[in-house]
Amino acid sequence: MSLRPCFVSLIDESDKPILIYVPNEAENEMNDVLKYNVLSNISLDYFESALVEWHSLDSKPLLKSIFQLEGVSVFAMLIKQTGLKIVIGFEQKSLSGADDEFEAINQIFETVRKIYIRVKCNPLLVSGDEKSIIKSLERKFDELFISTEVEL
């Protein structure tokens, strides 16, 4: 079974979106793209909520299922050291609730986090040039989510 995200959002420590990536954006309806932007915005409330515990005893970031809305299950991870927020949505009908599924979702988050770190720390990119960082992130996400499917 393949697991493919509907969207991937990277949000900085000041709650400014770095990138809201939608695989095959040209093929998606504009309403879907707008829906994913709204879901990313809604997720910010969960990061600020006192009801959601974002840290654990170990230093590993916690992955949380934060809400389901409009047929999309939204998961999030907060990297405390940098304030980076990663939000990824999956179609609810593609999720089975199997035990290994959460581990596969966690692996997708780790891959996204590593891609972000590699792009951000790339010495060939000018650190203040956000457009080149975004283009590089989009290209890497296209390679990950469009050219191959993530297998469970």
From Swiss-Prot:
Gene3D superfamilies attached here? 3.30.450.70
Ordered alphabetically, the record's keywords are: Golgi apparatus
One Pfam annotation, family name?
Answer: Sedlin_N
Location, primary (coarse class): Golgi
GO biological process assignments: early endosome to Golgi transport; endoplasmic reticulum to Golgi vesicle-mediated transport; intra-Golgi vesicle-mediated transport; protein-containing complex assembly; retrograde transport, endosome to Golgi
GO cellular component term, pick one:
cytoplasm
- Tell me yes or no: is Acyltransferase among this UniProt entry's keywords: no
Query: What does the UniProt entry say about where the protein is found?
Result: Golgi apparatus, trans-Golgi network
On subunit structure and binding partners, the annotation says: Interacts with the TRAPP II complex; TRAPP II subunits TRS33 and TRS65 are required for this interaction.
**Miscellaneous comment as given in the Swiss-Prot or TrEMBL entry:** Present with 8660 molecules/cell in log phase SD medium.
Q: What does this protein do?
A: Required, together with the TRAPP II subunit TRS33, for TRAPP II complex assembly or stability, and for proper Golgi localization of TRAPP and the Rab GTPase YPT31.
In the record, the note on similarity to other proteins reads: Belongs to the TRAPP small subunits family. Sedlin subfamily.
- This chain belongs to which protein, by name? TRAPP-associated protein TCA17
**Could you read off the lineage of the organism from its UniProt record?**
Eukaryota, Fungi, Dikarya, Ascomycota, Saccharomycotina
Instruction: Name the gene.
Output: TCA17
